[in-house]
Amino acid sequence: MRLIACIRSTLSVVLCVVALQSARANDVQPRLYSNVPTGVNFLSLVYAHSEGEVTFDDSVPLEDVEGDIDSYLVSFARGLNIGGKSVLLSVAVPYTDIALDGLYLGLPASGQRQGMGDPVVRLAVNLHGAPALTPEEFRSFKPKTIIGASFSVGIPLGRYDRDRVLNNGTNRWTLIGRLGLSHRIGQWEFESEAGVIWSSSNDEVLRTNRLEQDPTGLLRGGVIYHFGPGVWLGGGFSYLYGGDTKLNGVKRDDHRNNWRVGAAISFPLARGHQMQLRVTDGVASRIGGDFTTYALAYTRTF
């Protein structure tokens, strides 16, 4: 009986780890739909550290679980002109170090895993208010209302071991569609965004188990104040809802109802060199990680 309970609990831990991996879409990231000049490249290096409490459903005999995640990300993006629209195409490759510590049936337990995460390809199109501009035209551009859409694909190439609970990759495709709006009034910029996250099934959870997940809804809003060229301060919130999972066809009551708030500041180091500092914090988390995340990003424009 104890062995069966242990197996069931281990599968529940897998589902919680899935929630932690999907939580990256819930980060507060300002200025996702700002216009960019065509023909310009952006190379970014990002380090992020997340720490905090991990929340499981009541069927899991785990207590006082704390998690630490160190993430290193390299991304390359290029501004494009497609049909007169401003388009940003980007590719990001993460490397993560995940560690969990807590009590299992009252006894100390821990786990750690390092490796490459799932690469993400993102295509963002500004549908209104941000035409494709050359770098020379972009310098005199005054944004007002911008409507944009983006589509991201998470490719299951990250490190995944079907015999392990903790994994850096998800072993499934993830698609994220978003529609966003930004409006500029003087030095102030207001943003809102809605999206849906879809994921394919994973048929290799602990070798023989099948994981499915309902779509997850995403809402985000924020406000930014521009001090001058390249210098701004922003804050906002994000919300994830839904995403119930099925394990071997049995639906679980583990939908997300997670709120996060955050702030970011960006400033230039020199011409073509930009730094950004971000901090996000979990306000409420039903399933997954109630984490605080600190991120430092450097971007080279050329």
Question: Which residues fall in each region the model found?
Answer:
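Repeated loop/turn-to-beta-strand initiation elements of outer-membrane beta-barrel proteins
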Residues: 53-54, 84-87, 131, 187-190, ...
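Transmembrane beta-barrel strands of outer-membrane/channel proteins
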Residues: 43-49, 89-97, 149-155, 192-198, ...
